[in-house]
């Protein structure tokens, strides 16, 4: 006779199943399980008196015969493609299966074979996401990496050489010498990394030199002179070498207006940083570029979401980052021209419409490297409160039960979409078979704020951990700490370094003595907004030059600043 469990008891034992709902952190965002790949009555769970024991859930299969290295049991996966309950099998640092784990000798329908060589991670009651990708990094200090990792970020792309004045303002690692040193520094850092060369030049030689030196992309920044000639030159090099171009446009409109920049881009693929403009760009209307089909528009997190503090904090940040002098009226006017409540408010809504595709940090250069995921879901919460359910969620025939479509839209902004934009989606950016096992486990009450466990290349690299002298792992003080994969020779095989294909073909990794796997970026020049998952809307965006009001397809985009946010002071003292 079948044994029946109360739904609440089942969720507490094996995690939620199809139709169960949960709140994320202290937000108004509700997740509902869409499908359960496990089998009722055949669930696997580790522990005393539990299932994963010899001859029961654990088979006799060796690793050579197909047993996985690690199984994550009964995990609730939140990804751009769905929200499902499943077991996850890891092998050789990659995801090899998502489905049902167990012992095929006694159970049918097993996708993931558990053997004597298999480690178990309890996913029951946890949400699993792909490690986030921060694609707007100023590499000002190496301590950023630990802070980002502690927040659930496992890949960082950007530029810099340390706290140089140029790096403080621009995401560029200029020249072959600096690129080489940063690639060598990456060897000791527990993070997937890639570096952008400086793209500001009107002739190609110096740009080609940087791509051959290992740059995985090129960055155009107004502080180096983002002129139409530089834009055209940079894109021509990128097209030849298949690397992405990121752009911070001309706030002062000295070399041209937004129309001139669009003309210089000429329909070629480009990743526009802080597309709203507070982080920099043609004032006051750079935001309109998000309606171009070849543009991959992103935000940086200081404007995410629009709150009563947003405008006030921006002026001082901007003066410091861009080496401006408050005693010079022109410098103050430059700063003030970038900060507009109307465009920041519209940015919230454009994210909710899927017209902005990516969110990143702008680390220590007007952005906070440890808050990418937090601010992404704070924006989703604010839009749920102010705009209600998305039409796709409201269309559920059972009524508005969940925010699944909104959640899939926002998780894509920090995972798969930056991966696609930068040609690394074959390896990272989603919870899919074949991808690197860069996974983050969250307790639902701490989702987006503090990961419970970060897995990097199939090994635990960061975790919440208690007193090391305690008799069990849980006594306080409990806080995030680096784990074994972050140390010694385990670090190199757990992480990737992204380079241009041209650099790899010249045997650059061996010339520099690199031990980490060096992976080429691919397919960056034939993509567009259409490839941005759940975020490919193309409204016609217009800005009133007098009032700065923003319109999308003729509709005014405006919202109030948030007075209070979730995922904030209930969790964090500072």
From Swiss-Prot:
GO annotation, cellular component aspect: cytoplasm
Keywords: Cytoplasm, Hydrolase, Metal-binding, Nickel
Binding site for Ni(2+) 2: 219, 248, 274
Binding site for substrate: 221
Domain Urease: 131-574
Cofactor(s) listed: Ni cation
Any one Gene Ontology BP term: urea catabolic process
Organism domain of life: Bacteria
Gene3D superfamilies: Metal-dependent hydrolases, Urease, subunit C, domain 1
PROSITE patterns reported for this sequence: UREASE_1, UREASE_2, UREASE_3
One Pfam family of this chain: Urease_alpha
Cofactor note: Binds 2 nickel ions per subunit.
Compartment list: Cytoplasm
Sequence positions that bind Ni(2+) 1: 136, 138, 219, 362
Modification sites for N6-carboxylysine: 219
Subunit description: Heterotrimer of UreA (gamma), UreB (beta) and UreC (alpha) subunits. Three heterotrimers associate to form the active enzyme.
Protein family (similarity comment): Belongs to the metallo-dependent hydrolases superfamily. Urease alpha subunit family.
Protein name: Urease subunit alpha
Species this protein is from: Prochlorococcus marinus (strain MIT 9303)
